Amino acid sequence: MILSNRNGLKNTRNMLRVFGGLNETYSCTEAEYSAGINFSARNFPALSTRLPRRKLREEADLNGMYHLNGLLTVCGRDLVYTPDDADEMEVTLKDAVESGRKTLVGIGTRILIFPDKLAFDTASRKVSALGAVWSGKNASVEFAPCDAEGKVYEVSGCGPAEPDKPTDGQLFLRVEDPEKPWSSESTLEVYSEASGNWSAVVLDYCRISAKGVGTDFAAEDTVTLTGSAAEQAGQWNELDGDRIVYDAGTDALRVKADPGGEWFYGRLTRTGAAVRWVSLDGSVSREFVSAEVVELERRVPDMDYLTECDNRVWGCSNKENVIYACKLGDPTNWFSYRGIAADSYAVTVGSDGAFTGAATCMGYALFFKENTLHKLYGSKPSDFQLSSLRCRGVAKGAARSLCVINETLYYLSPDGVMAWDGSIPTKVSTALDPARLRNVKSALGGALDGRYYLHLVRGSGEAQAVRLLVYDTERGLWQEEDVCSYEMAGSGGQLYLWDGKAIWAADADREESWQQAGGIEDGVSFELVSGDIGLDSPEELYLSRLTLRLEAEVKSRIEVAVSYDSGAWETLAQLTADGRRCFDVPFVPRRCGSLRLRLKGRGQLTLRSLTRTSAAAKGGILAQEVN
């Protein structure tokens, strides 16, 4: 029997098993998706929904969050600290701060809180002020020359020559100029019977005495003294100004002060506006009036952006072009200049524009403007060096987007999301719609397992648009998750997020049971719109069949829909699973130029593969063998 000729079908079959991420540009391929929410690359090369989060506790008013040996949250005016150790109790400090947004940075066991200029110690669980101010408005304050031990002397006599028969320990003021007997040119001497000689007593310190004057200060502090009236009295030429505290008690402190002035050897007492000077032997006194008030202050500069590098806290403000660094290991002292390696540091930069952020990466303290990167490096103030690079810096309002992941710094610039690894910043957001990354009102960054979380806010009021983008730094893939990130804090092994109502943990399995408040999310709502499928087919091929391989990990419901040539969505299948289950969703698409697929539902879903079957066509009919 001879069979008649049959039409020859020329079909090809391709299976797509490696999926990319979000691509909002024209170049989005069928292996990527053009829009979607709550998908991740955790099961790469498959495409899976994100892991469910765990709710830790309700919190409606959060002004800041930081992790250091535990999670510190600024709740309104209160501080709440939850230690990592489950055996330790949570600590709440009422009315510890002012209400408002906070900038937090850690150094050692302390978390610094700005603009309040406070420090929370995670070891002692106490809050202390970084700066300190003491005012002598209603106090009696005495200034007296003293030696290195803080001792103040009284003399029994003075003159151009020492007494003939002195006693052991006798004090005498040897005068060089009889017209100025109490000036610093004279010399205070003490007699030693053992040696039979007079020796000079050096009074190169000043003892400041008043009730409570030393309560808030400590040895090695640098304080700014004003209103002493010492220069007016002629006792010290430059007592007012920055002074190093060498000893501090409750009612007295000792500062370094070089001798000087025509009335040096005496005690100066201020009570309100009245000033009285009395010589060391009590024979001479002078009185006058000064309108100033005595004040001692340990100053802390106003700073908007902070970072820790090499046991120093570095900071800058968007109101001035100065970069500050605190004293080595001491964030309470910012103006200590003694010429040693532990000194504070400050430098003025010459670039234009306001600072927009600060961070630490690769051992450098980095300070950004919108078009400039300033890099500070060195081991001590004497060899600190500042270099500047004109490049795409941090966008205005995006200071908190700065985040270090695997030795690379990520941040939002006016031109998109950048990555800096020590050389030139490179753009990593080419797959995202650039228009949705511009004119950002605020941006916040976080990190977990090599993923960069970027919270963006654009516009305000009803027109406000909020997004949470996630960048897989190892694979170079972008995803988008539902917004739960108005505040973020990372611990290295966990990322804490605040959605405006409660605090969540990004990875539920890493939280101890004692921290569970609301438990794990019962399901994750997801949606995905694929890129255009079929645009790469030549004219003589068309899609004859598509098969989706889906896997539900938990109880889930899934809707599969298709859109032909950017038309309306048509439902292909509605699937439900009571537990782990795999689905094959085949369908025959109608003739079209291109199509898109949409996956929508709730639960946990993994897209394993997409199989395309293409058939040959010619002139609108199946291709036949041509003799």
What are these regions (language model features)?
Residues M1-E88, E142-G150, R298-K375, L456-V470:
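N-terminal beta-propeller domains
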Residues I2-G70, K396-G397, E407-T408, D415, ...:
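Beta-sheet repeat architectures centered on beta-propellers
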Residues L71-L72, T109-I113, P163-V190, E220-T226, ...:
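Short hydrophobic/aromatic-rich beta-strand motifs
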Residues D78-Y81, K117-V133, Q170-L203, G234-N237, ...:
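Short, surface-exposed terminal/edge motifs of secreted or surface/virion proteins that either
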Residues S4-G8, L130-G131, S192-D221, T226-V300:
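Small/polar beta-strand repeat architecture
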Residues C75-G76, I107, F114-D116, S184, ...:
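Short loop/turn segments that connect beta-strands within the blades of beta-propeller domains
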Residues S40-E59, L79-S99, D121-E154, A194-D204, ...:
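Trp- and S/T/G-rich repeat-edge/linker motifs of beta-rich repeat architectures
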Residues T360-L366, N371-H374, C391-D421, L535:
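Structured, hydrophobic secondary-structure cores that serve as assembly/anchoring elements
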